[in-house]
Amino acid sequence: MRLDKFLKITRIIKRRTIAQQLCDSDNVLVNGKAQKPSYSIKKGDELVVKYFNNTIKAKVLEIPKESLKKEDIGDYVSFEN
């Protein structure tokens, strides 16, 4: 699954176009490296998303096959503080 789509489906970022812009401006790191929106996300990848004044750290647990309900997000992404 594409990185920008994963960010949208897991509700880390609200809109896919914003996810694409963040990736293009090197504000999304996967395993410590800036990645393009087309990067193919894998189970176990560690994400760092810099969004406004926030930094979101997350680990990919599973790749969703479709849009998720809010209560199901924890099955696919583990957030760090």
PLM features: residue spans?
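A basic, amphipathic helix-loop patch mediating RNA/tRNA/ribosome contacts
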Residues: 1-43
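Short linear motifs in intrinsically disordered/low-complexity regions
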Residues: 32, 46, 73-76
